[in-house]
């Protein structure tokens, strides 16, 4: 495992044997594999972007991707079976999207993330091949992870807002497009710009959740208690 997404990470450089938070290696590795597959789903969604407004499955893609990203944030989910279940779903969703993409005559790049097939028996092995450190360039790796953590935070806001029936498809589409960029882009300048753009969209996600809470529960104000 290798995880450095929180400020408590071992020695300030990264957890390699187990998470300071209590996350075990098999969970960290499973989360890496899930994120890897989400990038493939993001790419397929982007290739089919002309379908974004009318495809009946698009909202399901948005919901799954947000839920999956949310499940990998710090201290959110240490259940490897739960992450494996999401990997199962990601593979099935990817294959359906891939079939639709081929049906539409859209060219699909020859990438492992779009073709790899595996069962739970090999998830752990595959995860060690595509983790954070599989990117050899430290600068590119750092930028991509910074953006990834931004997407995870956005997904958390969006999931909470969706529970209150507040959904912004534009933000969901941004997440899909950015996942695709994380898969394909290795230009530091472009990734730096993308990190800044992700921050802008993160503020929009925060505003959506704030609106959802305000509409549902009214503005926060002090109350007297009987204590």
Which role does the model predict for each range below?
Residues 1-216:
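Often metal-dependent polyanion-binding catalytic scaffolds in large enzymes
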